């Protein structure tokens, strides 16, 4: 134990502000310069110490509980809770063993058709979230550069008083709310509703800086902004092109399906500037210059067209505009031009084209290696065009398999806090608002009255531009006013650029609220001294609110393949943490729209942090999602069906995801014909029993069997 403590220079690892101070010092040192070796050394020491301390504390907690149970003469209560890993979008199921309220063990679920009992290194460490010493333990307020513990009532009262003052003085658009892809579907949906009732569209989340280019690119190509097939369906692929994806590290369990496909003869090609662990498993590795994905893909198309490998019937029946693409490709993207742009010889490009064309169905996989470029949307469109030319979309083993990042980034995008749409990609036009006013059980004119004039149907600020919304002149931000108050709700700024500008923007705010299970880099940056020549707004107030992890609440989560799974609550909230949706309700109650927010929900009287809270039941929130999100088919995935799927995982085929039949012993629901997780679109009400759609745009099946065609326009 003494060795562990020495790594923190003798300071008490349980001091509330220890990590904040460490982050602040580290960030301060990092702003001018930090070489790679220093970064690795610091991060390695921190992680090692954290894991060691966490394990020791876990043993202490378990021993204490066991001793108390023995003294009381009571046998230990052991429960197994089924949850879903939070570390990526694959959706691996985990069974958590809880003894007397302490999470003591975790096991991968062998019955899960998605992960089949497998783990990656990240998933194997899942339990650390339930016992981390680095958790934010209580509400805190920044006072004279240091965080001080305060009560929940003080924090909520002061925050809402500041919000009301800003709303009155500078309109509701003076506040910006950054949501989270770590929220479950119910929390993400409730946050968008909550922000709407506050009276602004200034809300966003992580998808803006990861896969929003994918959503726009694929949605405007064939109708839905999502992965077309599934990880499991890749077992049916005869060839696979990974471009901008290092799945072996980022989505390790997804590689199981590809390795099974390779056993069946699938040819794996990896296109990446780096030789990655995924490339190490490839049949062909192609190194391109960073940012030249479009020339490369159009170079592949050149050989497809030049050799007559395109699917002419498919193009004639289902594709519009391919003649214009062919003309552009054949004139501009000759092998010589492609090699000049990408640095890839013609023979390598030809081999990729030949492999994709002669081994159909062939699939394409991309991640943020494409999407985070400044032209990410165009790169996504190029990938889509290649698959349309080859006739691979809407076919098992083909498709565009787009691996999302966070565990619920797909769900948060579908039903959560987007600045340019309401849940389900309903736009901001009056018709959309009237639809939701009806669903929410409130008057349309009441919602309209919550907004500043002309702002209700105007897109809000994005997470990538909130800095400008603070620092630029008001007439330059295309909003009613500058942003003066900011919520970081399950989001941290580490992955964004412009760190110095971000620090200046944070210093200029009048209100900064961080809602997170951990004291994130946001909290550290806020506590740092201002940059040279800068100053902190003397009226600024900074608060940290401890939220629970997803293992201390319950709700649904949408994997990258559009399958939805239900998480059980594993343990009660640690320390003084409170679930996100409960915090939303508490703020709404103080802001004057709590009744309107929860009018449709069953309300629970819950105990958190030693006090009573009004909690909207997550099942009730999902029921409202089922009644509202008709555009993309979130209507059939009721809590009852999802819970039955989680209990009956063993009846679903790991290759097709289809149930061979079996009744849930708890609810009596018969899973026969369902696809696991009821991947959207799952049309109609639960009574219709739509099975879900495993592969989008599959015309070999009827709509009621999970098939369907392209949509004429996104949102139709």
Per-region residue spans from a language model:
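Surface-exposed polar/charged interaction patches
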Residues: 29, 33, 628-631, 652
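Short amphipathic alpha-helical segments that mediate assembly, nucleic-acid/protein binding
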Residues: 16, 20, 618, 639-644
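Non-catalytic alpha/beta scaffold blocks inside enzyme catalytic domains
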Residues: 211-385, 389-395, 403-631, 635, ...
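Non-catalytic, alpha-helical, charged scaffold/linker segments
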Residues: 657, 662-664, 668-671, 675, ...
């Amino acid at each position: 134990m003494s060795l562990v403590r020495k790594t923190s220079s003798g300071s008490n690892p349980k001091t509330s502000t220890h990590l904040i101070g460490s982050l602040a010092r580290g960030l301060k040192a990092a702003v001018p310069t930090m070489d790679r070796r220093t970064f690795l050394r610091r991060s390695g020491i921190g992680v090692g110490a954290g894991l060691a301390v966490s394990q020791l504390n876990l043993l202490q907690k378990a021993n204490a509980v066991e001793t108390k149970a023995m003294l009381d003469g009571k046998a230990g209560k052991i429960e197994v809770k089924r949850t879903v890993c939070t570390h990526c979008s694959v959706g691996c199921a985990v069974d958590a063993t809880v003894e007397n309220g302490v999470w003591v063990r975790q096991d991968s679920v062998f019955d899960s058709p998605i992960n089949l009992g497998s783990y990656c290194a990240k998933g194997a460490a899942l339990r650390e979230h339930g016992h981390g010493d680095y958790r934010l333990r209580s509400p805190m307020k920044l006072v004279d550069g240091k965080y001080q513990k305060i009560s929940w009532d003080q924090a909520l009262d002061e925050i809402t008083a500041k919000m009301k003052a800003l709303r009155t003085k500078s309109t509701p658009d003076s506040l910006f709310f950054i949501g989270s892809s770590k929220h479950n579907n119910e929390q993400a949906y409730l946050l968008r509703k909550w922000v709407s009732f506050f009276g602004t569209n200034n809300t966003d989340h992580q998808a803006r800086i990861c896969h929003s280019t994918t959503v726009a690119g694929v949605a405007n190509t064939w109708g839905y902004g999502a992965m077309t097939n599934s990880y499991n369906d890749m077992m049916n692929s005869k060839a696979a092109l990974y471009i901008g994806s290092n799945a072996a590290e980022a989505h390790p369990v997804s590689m199981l399906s590809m390795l099974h496909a390779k056993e069946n003869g699938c040819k794996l090609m990896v296109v990446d500037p780096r030789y990655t662990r995924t490339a190490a498993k490839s049949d062909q590795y192609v190194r391109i210059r960073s940012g030249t994905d479009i020339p490369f893909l159009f170079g592949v198309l050149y050989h497809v067209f030049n050799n007559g490998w395109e699917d002419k019937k498919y193009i004639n029946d289902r594709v519009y505009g391919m003649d214009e693409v062919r003309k552009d490709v054949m004139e501009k993207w000759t092998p010589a031009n492609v090699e000049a742009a990408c640095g890839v010889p013609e023979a390598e490009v030809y081999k990729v084209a030949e492999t994709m064309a002669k081994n159909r169905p062939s699939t394409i996989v991309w991640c943020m290696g494409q999407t985070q470029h400044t032209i990410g949307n165009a790169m996504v469109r190029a990938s889509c065009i290649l698959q349309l030319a080859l006739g691979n979309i809407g076919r098992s083993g083909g498709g565009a398999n787009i691996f999302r990042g966070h565990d619920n980034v797909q769900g948060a995008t579908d039903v959560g806090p987007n600045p340019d749409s309401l849940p389900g990609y309903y736009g901001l036009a009056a018709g959309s608002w009237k639809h939701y006013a009806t669903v929410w059980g409130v008057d349309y004119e009441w919602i309209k009255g919550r907004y500043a004039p002309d702002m209700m149907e105007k897109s809000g600020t994005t997470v990538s531009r909130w800095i400008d919304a603070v620092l630029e002149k008001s007439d330059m931000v295309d909003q009613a006013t500058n942003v003066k108050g900011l919520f970081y709700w399950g989001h941290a700024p580490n992955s964004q650029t412009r760190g110095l500008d971000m620090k200046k923007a944070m210093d200029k705010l009048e209100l900064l609220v961080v809602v997170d299970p951990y004291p994130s880099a946001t909290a550290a940056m806020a506590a740092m001294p201002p940059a040279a020549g800068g100053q902190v707004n003397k009226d600024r107030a900074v608060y940290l609110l401890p939220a629970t992890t997803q293992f201390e609440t319950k709700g649904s989560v949408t994997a990258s393949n559009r399958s939805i799974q239900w998480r059980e609550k594993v343990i009660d909230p640690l320390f003084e943490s409170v679930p996100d949706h409960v915090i939303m309700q508490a703020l709404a109650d103080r802001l004057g729209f709590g009744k309107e927010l929860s009018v449709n929900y069953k309300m629970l009287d819950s105990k958190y942090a030693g006090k009573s809270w009004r909690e909207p039941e997550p099942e009730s929130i999902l029921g409202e999602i089922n009644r509202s999100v008709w555009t993309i088919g979130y209507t059939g995935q009721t809590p009852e069906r999802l819970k039955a799927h989680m209990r009956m995982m063993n009846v679903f085929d790991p290759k097709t995801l289809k149930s061979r039949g079996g009744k849930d012993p708890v609810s009596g629901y018969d899973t026969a014909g369902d696809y696991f997780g009821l991947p959207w679109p799952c049309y109609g009400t639960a009574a219709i029993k739509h099975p879900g759609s495993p592969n989008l745009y599959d015309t070999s099946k009827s709509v009621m069997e999970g098939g369907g065609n392209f949509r004429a326009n996104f949102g139709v």
